[in-house]
């Protein structure tokens, strides 16, 4: 019940975009995915986009190399992937890194595609009031924080 109450208390714009982009388009997108699958057409129901391999942490065991060359995915390539996905009925994206909040054009992606729903996978160390305000204004992004490590996190 508290989940429902929290959902009702959520910013109206965020709630509306969530229902439209995640629930409605998610349902329709999954339906289209099943139709494509029956026809033998392979295209995923949702995509994960790793926008950068740069990170502000050096976690033991992480695939992101702290000594390697920092690379960012070209913004036009990202927009192209998203546009092609929308043509296929897919409006759900996971945004990953490294640490995606390091990616300078991150919010441009969310702004250019208000008809999509994004989950932002972050270590949370760069998340602040400014980021929270931007995400609330955009209303099409849910931040997800990973906490990995031992007791000294």
Report residues per predicted region:
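N-terminal pre-core extensions flanking Radical SAM catalytic domains
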Residues: 1-69, 86
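Rieske [2Fe-2S] iron-sulfur-binding domain
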Residues: 71-73
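Radical SAM/AdoMet-radical enzyme domain recognition
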Residues: 75-95, 103-153
């Amino acid at each position: 019940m508290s989940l429902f109450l929290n959902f009702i208390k959520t910013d109206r714009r965020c709630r509306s975009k969530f229902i439209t982009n995640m629930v409605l388009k998610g349902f329709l997108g999954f339906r289209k995915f099943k139709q494509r699958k029956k026809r033998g057409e392979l295209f995923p129901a949702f995509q994960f986009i790793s926008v950068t391999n740069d990170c502000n942490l050096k976690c033991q065991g992480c695939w992101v190399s702290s000594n390697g060359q920092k690379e960012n995915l070209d913004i036009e390539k990202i927009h192209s992937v998203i546009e092609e996905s929308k043509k296929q009925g897919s409006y759900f994206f996971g945004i990953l890194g490294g640490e995606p909040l390091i990616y300078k054009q991150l919010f441009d992606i969310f702004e250019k595609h208000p008809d999509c729903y994004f989950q932002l996978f972050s270590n949370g160390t760069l998340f602040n009031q400014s980021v929270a305000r931007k995400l609330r204004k955009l209303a099409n992004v849910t931040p997800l924080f990973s906490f990995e490590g031992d007791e000294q996190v």
